[in-house]
Amino acid sequence: MLVHPNPDPIAFSIGPVDIHWYGLMYVLAFAMFIILGRVRIKQPHIAAQGWKPEDLDDMLFYGMLGVVLGGRLGEVLFYQPGYFFENPLEIFKVWKGGMSFHGGFLGVLIAMALWARKSKRNILDVYDFIAPMVPLGYAAGRLGNFINHELPGRIADPSLPWAMLWPNPNGIGFLDTPRHPSPLYQMLIDGILVFLILWPFARKARPRLAVGAMFTLLYGCARFFTEWFRVPDWETTVMGLPITSGQVLSLPMIVAALVMLAWAYSSRDGRQTLRST
């Protein structure tokens, strides 16, 4: 059995300004977007579409706004509306954590649609381009959740080698029963594993929307699975089976991804895009 290291959420201070680990994970995520993006624009089928390094800088600016605004708004609306209604000023304290991936996902889609319109690019091509860079950034965010000891897991069998004593939310000691380290599960499965599958898939020319749809499908399925190990923000039942808030939000992603994949591989537009790269 393991014990959560329970580090100080403040990594270091510069004068009166505290730099939080959670914020540093977002910096790491944005840096990986640029690094992976520079690798991606050198791939022949991507270079043929005319992507340039300066496009990455523009997309990063739009994407940062989409992630932060959408992620926070999603946390408020999807997960903790009651808490934020009673404590509205807490909405602005993003350094404490509390960012919804599903909200950030929608925020980034809106931001990329705006950038695509500005740059006169097809939004489907933009989604295909950025999708392989998302999972590692997501993994960094989940590591930030772990450092902040957020998203505690469900009670685990003490004999499980990686069962973990989790810090008590009241700040004193640890919870009595070991837990699944759910942020690490989501970092490894929803983030790193999805990246390891998606990146090789995206290295070859695919029909328009195929890469974006594959990311949506992989993440939706991975998130649906890892939600079983996480204490849900809220839970409901579907056909008599308990289902968590994250699973409710992931199901539409899975359905939409299957529709998008079918369109990508059967539509004339998707096949034409593949022939032109």
Label every PLM stretch briefly.
Residues M1-T277:
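Hydrophobic, membrane-interfacing alpha helices
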